[in-house]
């Protein structure tokens, strides 16, 4: 099922992303730059290993993981987190934990688009990506 997420995805819409970053403690200047970028996400699968690369003029990140196995991650805003990604009901659920906090990044496919829902406490941001040819 994770195969359905494989591809190159370009951000086309973003809702409430600044509030989400603010809730994580991201500084004003970084939020301003990050809010203006339109990142490309590349999802690859090689055997049991999934790679998610996020590329933008702001910062490039890459994570490699296997479903259900916790791993260390350094986020785009330089948080050092413990991450766990699972597949549940056709959704990739990515949970990051650090310093007693937790945020969830849920990726799902809706009408051929990749919908990324970011949740931290009561703050929710939705980012919509379209697949590139």
Swiss-Prot record:
Annotated GO CC locations: cytosol; extracellular space; sarcoplasm
Molecular functions per Gene Ontology: cytoskeletal protein binding; icosatetraenoic acid binding; long-chain fatty acid transmembrane transporter activity; oleic acid binding
Q: Where does it localize?
A: Cytoplasm
Main localization category = cytoplasm
Superkingdom of origin:
Eukaryota
One Pfam family from the record: Lipocalin
Binding, octadecanoate: 127-129
Record keywords, A-Z:
Acetylation, Cytoplasm, Lipid-binding, Phosphoprotein, Transport
Q: What are the N-acetylalanine sites (modified residues) in this protein?
A: 2
Indicate where the modification Phosphothreonine is found in the sequence: 8, 30
Free-text comment about domains: Forms a beta-barrel structure that accommodates the hydrophobic ligand in its interior.
Q: Which family does it belong to?
A: Belongs to the calycin superfamily. Fatty-acid binding protein (FABP) family.
Q: What is this protein called?
A: Fatty acid-binding protein, heart
